[in-house]
Amino acid sequence: ASPPQEVKYAIQFVKDHPESPVSVYLTDKYFLQNEGADYKQALELVNLMSAEQPKNGTLSMLKSQLHRLKNASIGNRLPNFTARDMDGKLVKAADLRGKTIIISTWASWSYESLDTQRSLDELSKKGQATVIGICVDADVKEARNIIERDNISFRNICDGQMMEGKLLKILGLNTVPDNIVIKNGKITERRVNASTLRQRLNNLNK
């Protein structure tokens, strides 16, 4: 997370200069790319900038992303969803309640996300979490090949719609790698990186 003072300065800059492209950059950096950010406040800033920059397409995109993040922010309950995994079986939010769940995005072109997948698979095999992967590749066959190559055991979803998939929007997942952690039906963490996952694995092995 970003130091609170930096976030405070960024907010003040946006309020003082809603017409500036720098304000758009700061909002993206300190709210969309910052886990645990105040998405409600970010939306207020985006609305302020939109009044001064009505034709800015980036702001429209930020607003859309923030609405999704707000609905699936830390402390909120896991939004309802239904999807099919790559074996054609239904994956429903209602079936995931009361467990520790990690839902993670990945892609064939993102080494970091593949590294995260392998760490998540270890957690899954040790029974520490139920993991669901969402592949954002356009080629479902390529995604299946990678799962088989890396011997990934947990369920994966790949609808071929890349970052425009419905499930990504429902869960507020907008980058690769990205993830949410759900405990007892509530979102408790976002964007846990591979090194943190490995540390947790090391702690389990002690």
Report residues per predicted region:
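Hydrophobic beta-strand anchors of alpha/beta hydrolase catalytic cores
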Residues: I102-I103, V131, N179
